[in-house]
A protein has these predicted regions:
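Short, electropositive alpha-helical surface patch
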Residues: 49-65, 175-179
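Short amphipathic alpha-helical interaction patches enriched in hydrophobic/aromatic residues
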Residues: 6, 10, 66-70, 181-184
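A conditional alpha-helix N-cap/helix-loop micro-motif detector
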Residues: 20, 74-78, 166
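Von Willebrand factor type A / integrin I
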Residues: 84-94, 105, 109-208
Length: 208
């Protein structure tokens, strides 16, 4: 997910920077296992697709693209990426979806993909996205639509409504993913992401 909502962060790094680091680690791990690796960059459309291949040269190309990629659009539509993935990847694969999952509905293509492939959702988020500090009247701009509104954060009801709306969306995603057989890893900016990844894969190894 290379949409504009990734350009948010309040503790040392943006969400997109965190996603980039994780994508690079996952790609490097494929070298050791001699796995094929591909990548789909998406916003509200598929921006670029690098088909799966083996080899260090190919992996390094993917990492260069991940580090330097500049999307042409700002919005997010995960369903577009999933539909494209379903159409171009025929063999059963492990698919890591790195996104904040702030998107238009995507349940239908997710269900289709999860029946054929092994999906892992890495929800990249920042803790400040789920809170609104009491600092008076502040401008808030949607990174994807560029719409700007002013919010009176001194109003307790407004702060509570903001938090509730945000948590409702997060909980909806957390409920949907396991219901369709998709594993979820929650990773926040400013926190160690190596340990959650290691714990996740260790847990998977035990299940198998």
């Amino acid at each position: 997910d290379v949409s504009a909502s990734g350009n948010f962060g309040t503790k040392d790094q943006f969400k997109r920077e965190l996603a980039t680091e994780i994508a690079a680690i996952l790609a490097f791990s494929a070298i050791k296992n001699n796995d094929k690796v591909g990548v789909i960059f998406f916003t509200d459309k598929v921006e670029e697709f690098i088909p799966p291949k083996k080899g260090k040269k190919h992996i390094l190309r993917i990492i260069r693209e991940v580090l330097a990629f500049q999307p042409s659009r700002k919005k997010t539509d995960i369903s577009e990426a999933l539909e494209y993935f379903n159409s171009v990847i025929k063999r059963r694969s492990i698919c890591f979806i790195l996104s904040d999952f702030i998107s238009a509905p995507f349940e239908k293509p997710l269900r289709i993909a999860s029946k054929k492939h092994d999906l892992v959702a890495l929800r990249i988020h920042d803790r400040r996205e789920s809170s609104l500090p009491n600092v008076g009247l502040v401008p808030i701009q949607d990174a994807e639509t560029e719409e700007m509104i002013f919010i009176d954060t001194s109003n307790k009801k407004i702060r509570l409504d903001f938090v509730k709306n945000r948590l409702d969306k997060i909980n909806a995603v957390k409920k949907l993913l396991p219901n369709v057989g998709v594993d979820l890893i929650d990773i926040s900016t400013g926190n160690d992401y190596i340990k959650p990844l290691i714990n996740f894969f260790k847990g998977r190894g035990k299940k198998r």
